[in-house]
Regions:
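Function-critical acidic carboxylates
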Residues: 1-118
Length: 118
């Protein structure tokens, strides 16, 4: 079965430490993928959602005082309306953007195949 992007949503917030993004009608067993872009190279402390899906950080890259980017996945989603909450590790607020995607067709376990960084 081919992997297909089912739906996506994004949210941006200036000067925050917590932010949410939501998808409606997520299919049971689908893959949820989240990309977090942060200002000032701030890392993400936690990713949780309203359905209790377990989130795993797959990749990250940071430039001190500049940009941070992280990739997170929740394989085998419980399904239903899902609101994802991201909390940053920094006590001070920064600008950050979330991109949340739902995919059908990928494996429901061990969805992360490989990571490469330079």
């Amino acid at each position: 079965m081919a992997t297909t992007l089912t739906q996506s949503a994004h949210a941006s917030n200036a000067g925050a430490t917590t932010q949410t993004v939501a998808l409606s009608g997520v299919g049971k067993g689908h893959l949820l993928s989240l990309v977090v872009f942060t200002g000032n190279g701030v890392a993400t402390a936690s990713v949780t959602d309203s359905q209790g899906n377990p989130w795993i950080r797959n990749a990250d890259a940071y430039a001190s005082g500049s940009l941070g980017v992280e990739g997170w996945n929740a394989s085998g989603a419980i399904g239903g309306n899902t609101t994802v909450t991201v909390t940053l590790s920094a006590a001070s607020a920064t600008d950050f953007t979330l991109v949340l995607m739902e995919f059908t067709g990928p494996p429901t376990v061990n969805a992360m195949d490989q990571e490469n960084a330079n």
